[in-house]
């Protein structure tokens, strides 16, 4: 059930941030190439059930599924403008409103459903498959042909299929079908078949041993690509995917069980001028849920996207593969770890790296999968991407079953930048910016405004994605010691610009601030001072620009902070639902030091600082952490074959500020509190190898020694620093003394 095809040259997505002092950046443009579809959801009529199928012709989008009515955008189910639509509705692609074509797909016994739609190459006939026995009262048998001009059933196309049809594709003379069936017009056909456009039998034979779920004709018409649950086609081993001859059905290319695991199936297939693309779904462990690109020339793999989260639909538009899924873990693609599901994604047809296009739905009804089908239709010089499924919200707004996006104009404004400004050394102010999020623009332009001026003093362009929002740092050296300055920042996609960020007011330092100066001198590559009073941003004061994110709204701007006499603030966590994590993924450090200050009276313990493999949810793998027991003792833990820990003899939940440093390197593990060594183990010099993120305030502690009641820390934390080396005892004592004495 394919739709519009369109090809253009792919462009490489820019990544990372630009440093201060670099050459003048190119300003961002709306829709970062090669993305050519906005993420702005347009007003669209909605269904009261699930949309499984789509096709388009001449500016009309046809939808099928399991539903009984449609209603305008913004109207709740049962509203005054709701109208009957029995498992089918046709819409104007440009307006999102229903057309006059109204068809009812019904069945005498059971639940009728439309699962596949395809349009003939001349745009005259719509083919519909599913499980139904009549269309507008005209008897049919799970397959029907509709004359589009008159919106009537073609009675000259009478094909009896004995079970559900789940996939359709059409040429000028042949209709191919896949599904659960075992016979077509009384003749044996297992799960795949073909008939003429007049409804007559053909010689095509491609018998699968399990249901067919997808099929697509190659652009030259020579082959048909089959997808489904099968392990064999015409007796030839080929799991879930096979290429067959379009005339005979003979297997042209098979795929062994190692290509797509036995736990996974193919749910959708699409093509362009050079490739074949599959959407895949798995069940159980060891599954493949992502997307595969095959070269059309030899049907061999071009790339594979191994994100987890069942892919239901794939669609190519201008050299970008768009997909509908509920992708929740793309860590194997070096992208985001297991977290909240993302339902709509984009990647180049030449490279599976995610592009900057992230409109979103929820899981919705039924199986809770979200989007199930996509189609692109053109009208009035604008292209529209329609999405159907079981979702009930789009971009956080109530919208059921259907939505659509367009090729322009782009109206979505980026999020307002989060900003922190500070001055630690005379002669400079550091302005730190957390890059913004724009659902269809990964590259944005940032402008810094000083002292209320209308003209920016600094401009740069940087890339960001929902799971990685790099910190930008600009150093203002045009300052006078003791003078006060204000800074505000905007983000722009070239068309839409945010309001200016809240004002950051800074007094330029007159003398070096002793504690942070020493932390930076000793080489910290993450240094969070928690001087922000609002938003979710944790600014990194180190040269690494490894900013972080607060989860759950911990209390910011808590005063006084840990460091005597400098007026800095801390952050307080509630011990149940709040933590912070670093934005950048890091390799496991070999030699390192973890440093922070804390204050608490908790009797439920919790993690203070640690390393873990996830961000917005509890990590599955954790170590290199300092946590507190219910009794207030501190434990430093490392995973080295098994969990290895060292523990203080004293308790530190006395409501006072304490300084803790944990180090590991060639001399083993050491744990210091308030400048003095409290525990050590010289034997443990290494740890398990994995990539992860630094967490503050809590993370998973399952399986660790003296596990406290809570994984999360109830108390205040300040001045967290990570070093890529082992701090010496004298350095640690110096830090403690500087912090206590100012």
Question: What kind of feature is each model-predicted range?
Answer:
Residues 79-80, 525, 534-538, 576-635, ...:
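Extracellular glycan-recognition modules
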Residues 512-519, 572-592, 645-651, 708:
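Short surface loop/edge beta-strand patches of beta-sandwich-type extracellular domains
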Residues 681-716:
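Flexible glycan-contacting loops in extracellular carbohydrate-active proteins
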Residues 506-576, 618, 679, 732-742:
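Extracytoplasmic low-complexity segments
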Residues 435-441, 493, 532-546, 600-602, ...:
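Extracellular acidic, Ser/Thr/Pro-rich low-complexity tracts
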């Amino acid at each position: 059930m394919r739709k519009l095809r369109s090809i253009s040259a792919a462009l490489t997505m820019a990544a990372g941030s630009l440093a201060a002092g670099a050459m003048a950046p190119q300003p961002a443009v709306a829709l970062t190439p090669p993305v050519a579809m906005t993420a702005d959801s347009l007003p669209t009529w909605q269904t009261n059930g699930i949309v499984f199928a789509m096709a388009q012709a001449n500016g009309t989008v046809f939808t099928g599924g399991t539903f009984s009515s449609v209603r305008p955008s913004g109207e709740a189910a049962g509203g005054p403008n709701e109208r009957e639509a029995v498992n089918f509705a046709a819409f104007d692609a440009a307006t999102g409103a229903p057309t006059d074509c109204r068809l009812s797909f019904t069945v005498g016994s059971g639940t009728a459903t439309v699962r596949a739609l395809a349009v003939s190459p001349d745009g005259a006939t719509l083919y519909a498959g599913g499980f139904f026995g009549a269309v507008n009262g005209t008897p049919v048998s799970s397959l029907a042909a509709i004359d589009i001009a008159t919106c009537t059933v073609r009675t000259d196309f009478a094909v009896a299929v004995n079970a559900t049809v789940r996939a359709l594709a059409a040429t000028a003379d042949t209709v191919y079908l896949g599904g659960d069936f075992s016979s077509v017009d009384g003749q044996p056909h297992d799960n795949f078949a073909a008939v003429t456009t007049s409804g007559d039998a053909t010689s095509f034979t491609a018998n699968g041993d399990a249901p067919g779920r997808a099929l697509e004709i190659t652009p030259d018409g020579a082959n048909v690509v089959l997808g489904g649950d099968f392990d064999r086609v015409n007796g030839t081993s080929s799991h879930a995917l096979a290429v067959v001859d379009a005339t005979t059905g003979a297997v042209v290319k098979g795929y062994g069980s190692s290509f797509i695991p036995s736990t996974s199936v193919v749910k959708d297939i699409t093509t362009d001028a050079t490739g074949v693309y599959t959407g895949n779904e798995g069940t159980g462990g060891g599954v493949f849920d992502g997307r595969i690109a095959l070269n059309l020339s030899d049907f061999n793999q071009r790339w594979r996207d191994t994100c987890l989260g069942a892919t239901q639909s794939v669609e190519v538009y201008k050299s970008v593969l768009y997909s509908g899924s509920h992708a929740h873990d793309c860590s194997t693609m070096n992208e985001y770890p297991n977290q909240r599901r993302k339902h709509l994604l984009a990647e180049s047809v030449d490279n599976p790296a995610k592009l900057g296009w992230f409109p979103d739905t929820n899981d919705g009804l039924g199986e809770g999968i979200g989007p199930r089908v996509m189609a692109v239709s053109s009208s009035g010089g604008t292209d529209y991407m329609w999405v159907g499924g079981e979702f009930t919200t789009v971009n956080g707004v109530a919208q059921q079953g259907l939505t659509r996006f367009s090729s322009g104009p782009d109206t979505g404004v980026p999020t307002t930048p989060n900003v922190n400004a500070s001055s630690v050394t005379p002669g400079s102010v550091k302005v730190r910016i957390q890059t913004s999020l724009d659902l269809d623009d990964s590259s944005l332009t940032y402008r810094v405004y000083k002292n209320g001026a209308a003209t920016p003093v600094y401009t740069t362009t940087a890339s960001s994605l929902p799971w990685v929002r790099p910190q930008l740092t600009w150093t203002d050296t045009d300052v006078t010691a003791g003078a006060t300055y204000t800074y505000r920042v905007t983000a722009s996609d070239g068309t839409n610009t945010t309001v200016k960020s809240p004002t950051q007011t800074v007094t330029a330092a007159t003398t070096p601030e002793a504690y942070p100066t020493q932390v930076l001198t000793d080489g910290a590559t993450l240094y969070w001072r928690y001087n922000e009073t609002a938003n979710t941003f944790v600014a990194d004061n180190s040269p690494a620009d490894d900013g972080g994110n607060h989860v759950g709204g911990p209390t910011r701007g808590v005063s006084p902070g840990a460091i005597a006499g400098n007026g800095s603030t801390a952050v307080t966590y509630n011990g149940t639902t709040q933590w912070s994590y670093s934005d950048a993924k890091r390799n496991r450090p070999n030699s390192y030091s973890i440093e922070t200050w804390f204050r608490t009276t908790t009797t439920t313990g919790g993690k203070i600082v640690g390393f873990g493999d996830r961000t917005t949810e509890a990590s599955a793998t954790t170590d290199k952490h300092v946590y507190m027991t219910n009794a207030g003792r501190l434990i430093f833990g490392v995973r080295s074959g098994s969990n290895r820990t060292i523990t203080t003899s004293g308790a530190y939940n006395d409501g006072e500020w304490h300084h803790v440093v944990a180090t590991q390197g060639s001399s083993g593990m050491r744990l210091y509190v308030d400048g003095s060594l409290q525990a050590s183990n010289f034997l443990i010099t290494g740890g398990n190898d994995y990539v992860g993120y630094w967490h503050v305030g809590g993370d998973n502690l399952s399986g660790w020694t003296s596990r406290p009641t809570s994984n999360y820390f109830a108390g205040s934390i300040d001045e967290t620093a990570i070093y890529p080396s082992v701090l010496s005892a004298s350095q640690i004592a110096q830090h403690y003394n500087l912090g206590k004495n100012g």
